[in-house]
Structure formats: structure tokens, C-alpha cells
């Protein structure tokens, strides 16, 4: 009876894929309406002028222009789009 019994499987060996979050367009970059500026979980960055906030807290441009990151009320980080002059 020199047989091997069934070996147990490892409890490890699984990991979720990355969610591709983060800044997609950096400060000073030119964007057009509808461009995604950043993807986030929660509002680490808040929407400023000429940007919208999606239901998954994605910040996107509503008008063409340049991306601007700035601090505002209570130290919050805001993202705006400044129209090109």
C-alpha cells in the first residue's frame, strides 16, 4: 500500500486585480470635454470649476482647457479645468 493520499490545496494563491485608480491627466495637461482626469474611491479629490463627479467618484472634464490641482477650503484638494486663453 505505497500510495499517496490526496494532498490538501494551499489556502493562499488568490489575489484581486488592480482597479486602475489614480490620476489620468496631470496638472497642466490639456483636456477636452468628457476626458477622465482621475479615478478614485471616495472623494480624496473634490470637483472644482468645469469638472464633474461621477457616481463612482470619477472626476471628469466638462469643458476644454488645462487641468489644475489646488488646495481649498479646510485643506481639501480640488481639481479644476481652466479654459485656455
Swiss-Prot record:
Residue segments, region Disordered: 1-21
Superkingdom, natural source: Bacteria
Gene Ontology MF: a single term: structural constituent of ribosome
InterPro entries: Ribosomal_bL27 (IPR001684), Ribosomal_bL27_CS (IPR018261)
Family annotation (NCBIfam families): L27
PANTHER family to which the protein is assigned, alphabetical: LARGE RIBOSOMAL SUBUNIT PROTEIN BL27M (PTHR15893:SF0), RIBOSOMAL PROTEIN L27 (PTHR15893)
Protein name, per record: Large ribosomal subunit protein bL27
